[in-house]
Amino acid sequence: MNVTAIYPGTFDPITLGHADLVGRASRIFDRVILAVAESKAKTPLFDFGERLALAREAVAEMPNVEVVGFNSLLVDCARTHGATVILRGLRAVSDFEFEFQMAGMNRSLGPEIETIFLTPGESYAFLSSSVIREIAKFGGDVSAFVPGHVRAALMRKFAGSG
């Protein structure tokens, strides 16, 4: 059985926690789609193209991982790419309620697609893209939390601000 999982998010920016989860998923599933949401509801720091490029570079060494962009219902994106599993990370109990609601809605819209939760590695349980952006905005060192190319992109974004 060939199983494809889809891992959606805005990835603004992608962190080592995201990359760790994708790497672990790539050992479980035959194929992993990292799906970058265009997300017009949010005001991202990095535009859609930048987020796609940063994500692609972050997973470049993972041969069974592919990065795609989407601006549709997640279940429609999953179907388009042949994914039968939605992969979500749970950092804390506080994430559970929202993720539980989303899993129920996705199951309602796409009953053939299962949602599976992975917990982060201990080193990454506290990471979030919004916290990373805030640290970088004020000149803090984010090198332990994001890939080097993401750190450089953050530094360029915030050059002269903060």
Swiss-Prot record:
GO terms for molecular function: ATP binding; pantetheine-phosphate adenylyltransferase activity. It is found in: Cytoplasm. ATP binds at T10, F11, H18, G89, L90, R91, E99, Y124, A125, F126, L127, S128, S129, S130. It catalyses: (R)-4'-phosphopantetheine + ATP + H(+) = 3'-dephospho-CoA + diphosphate. The keyword Ribosomal protein does not apply. It holds the Pfam family CTP_transf_like. The record marks H18 as: Transition state stabilizer. Its EC number is 2.7.7.3. GO terms for biological process: coenzyme A biosynthetic process. Substrate binds at T10, K42, L74, R88. Its cofactor is Mg(2+). One of its GO terms (cellular component) is cytoplasm. It comes from the Bacteria. It is an enzyme of class 2 (transferase). Keywords: ATP-binding, Coenzyme A biosynthesis, Cytoplasm, Magnesium, Nucleotide-binding, Nucleotidyltransferase, Transferase. Reversibly transfers an adenylyl group from ATP to 4'-phosphopantetheine, yielding dephospho-CoA (dPCoA) and pyrophosphate. Homohexamer. This is Phosphopantetheine adenylyltransferase. It comes from Methylococcus capsulatus (strain ATCC 33009 / NCIMB 11132 / Bath). The gene is coaD.
